[in-house]
Amino acid sequence: MKKVKIIMIVMLTGIFSLHIRAQSVSTGLDLVSTYVWRGTKLSGASIQPLLQFTKGGFSIGSWGSAGFDGFLEMDLFARYAFNFGLTAGLTNYYFPGTNYFDYSKDTGSHGYEINLGYNMQGFSVSANYMLNEAGGAKTAGGDKYFELGYTRKNISLFAGAGDGWHTPTGEFGVVNLGLSATKELLISETFRVPVKLSAILNPTTKQYYLTAGITL
């Protein structure tokens, strides 16, 4: 629990210190028909805001999802992108409705995950590892997720597998197979809206999703 508190303090301190000397501040807002994360449906139609501070290859910020069905998720993240395609980071998952300051194993509300990714000429691979067990966040500790992807022009293919909170039983399985396509929707001569469509199959839960999203 003490280690988890230290991680949280470091992340929050980083947000404020980077805010002071940030070279780039970016915001974003996505509207999605269904919130599907790593092959699992977490909520229906959702609004997903982003606030990010960037300095060189380092970025830190907060991302959230607010579903019209009441589902809420508010995350903190920090990551560094190296110039040879490697990205390393840490994500703090939090789901409002639980005590934000509860870091215990039985009822803790935060899940801390190490994130590694590598991209090269359209190919991508990522590995993620959950550091802690937290009953409130439903993490088992040691949860793993791996994903392979390939992007060509506006089409992306992906395949992901994981265990822990990624599957109903906690056993390792393929959970995220799919295809995404992006296109800019012309609203006027000066205004375009990026649109993303995704077809997602979860072989473990035997569920299929077709989702749509726009970025404002």
What label would you give each PLM region?
Residues G85-A140:
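Hydrophobic, well-structured mid-protein blocks that either form specific transmembrane helices
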Residues V25-T27, G57-S62, F84-G89, M120-A127, ...:
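Repeated loop/turn-to-beta-strand initiation elements of outer-membrane beta-barrel proteins
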Residues S156-I187:
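Outer membrane beta-barrel transmembrane domains
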Residues Y118, L179-A181, L185, P203-L216:
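Outer-membrane beta-barrel "beta-signal"
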Residues V4, F58-N83, T87-S104:
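Surface-exposed loop and membrane-interface regions of Gram-negative outer-membrane beta-barrel proteins
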Residues Q23-F68, N128:
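Short glycine/proline- and aromatic-enriched beta-strand/turn motifs that initiate or cap beta-hairpins
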Residues W37-A45, W63-M74, F101-H110, M130-D143, ...:
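Solvent-exposed loop/turn segments connecting transmembrane beta-strands
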